[in-house]
Amino acid sequence: AGLNPIAIEDLTGFPEMMDGRVKTLHPAVHGGVLARRDLETHMASMAEHNIAPIDLVCVNLYPFEQTIRREGVSEPEAIEQIDIGGPALVRSAAKNHPFVAVVTMPSQYDSLVTELSQHDGCTSFALRRELASAAFARTAEYDATIAAWMSGTSGTTFPSVLRLNYVGQHQLRYGENPHQAAAVY
């Protein structure tokens, strides 16, 4: 596909540690993602610390949701599937969407590839904004799932906060009245 990926250790100059728990939480990664390209001070900091700009972040979060659905999964197994660096990286990229595209689901790959091929390897602000919105929704869903699981395993009958995620099914022609928009979730 014309990509030249490099190992995270080569980017950071620092090896993975703590059984892979610490990989991407590094200024060479987050600095490259969070730097505003329109601020001279940000660009000067990047140059001073030899940080390259990162324009595209693609993260598939650890499969926590699938792990806790498995029969007989232990609490330590589930906890090891709680992604820390992935959501942090996703949120960094989504925050800086005026300059960075963030992809969080394989279903987004085709639209990204189409956009890149149509815009000489670049993405439009509209796509970056759409992807950022989806990224924040994904990390919110991920965190809500973790919170619900932890609440359910702590012996609490009812969680103090209950978050529900609804998936859009389709848009309706109109709402209760013809001038209103509506959708089914």
Report residues per predicted region:
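Short coil/turn connectors at secondary-structure junctions
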Residues: 2-4, 27-30, 51-56, 65, ...
